[in-house]
């Protein structure tokens, strides 16, 4: 317990089930285990990773399908089959895929949070900017253009305190900490959803939010699917929380077959 902290990710039992410390009282802690706990008993070993629940941010996020703790379902299915066993620890981003990085900065350039090191053409229509992480400021010592895996070193950054850090294509970020931003722009442009009733009577602004309340079976998920399919946006992030299995199956079957009318892809 001396090395454990609130919200640390832990591994529980022989199967190393993934959990999170949600409460601490002296030498006792309450752990929320994110997997089936059958078979756990008194005396089972619990090991703290020493880090909070975090996600990986970098090239490869787009077109991916994850569970609630960012484990890639596609690669897990390939390795372990459709019945996912407990305790799987799979990296969120493919460690073997190679991306072409185009550097925009060079030796001696000063950088701060949000400054763009360079870009990766992640999809045919999305250019992924590799940026300096929040709370980091310093001077670029090295930065290379070329083909890299997400964990390869693409350069070096000398921080203001004199320490030197490697620059890679991937960043880790704790899920309970909001990403900082310099400012928030007011919504001024409508988002065309493709649903005439919504666009005419209940318009939604780009940068805004929408709430679709209703009882069971009223079509809330259908509206969500339609907005995700046809809205005038560059990128759709679909999150299914508490959805029926058949509804999520529809998403996985239909969305990859859609064609974006703006790009033809």
Report the location of each language-model feature.
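N-terminal accessory targeting/assembly segments
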Residues: 1-85
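Short, solvent-exposed secondary-structure boundary/capping segments
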Residues: 28-34, 72-78, 129-130, 142-144, ...
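ATP-binding Walker
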Residues: 218
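Short alpha-helix capping/helix-loop boundary micro-motifs
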Residues: 1, 29-35, 95-106, 139-143, ...
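The Walker A (P-loop) glycine that initiates the GxxxxGKT/S ATP-binding motif of P-loop NTPases
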Residues: 214-215
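P-loop NTPase nucleotide-binding/switch module
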Residues: 78-124, 128-133, 149-209, 223-226, ...
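Conserved P-loop
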Residues: 221-264
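Conserved hydrophobic positions within beta-strands
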Residues: 21, 65, 116, 140-142
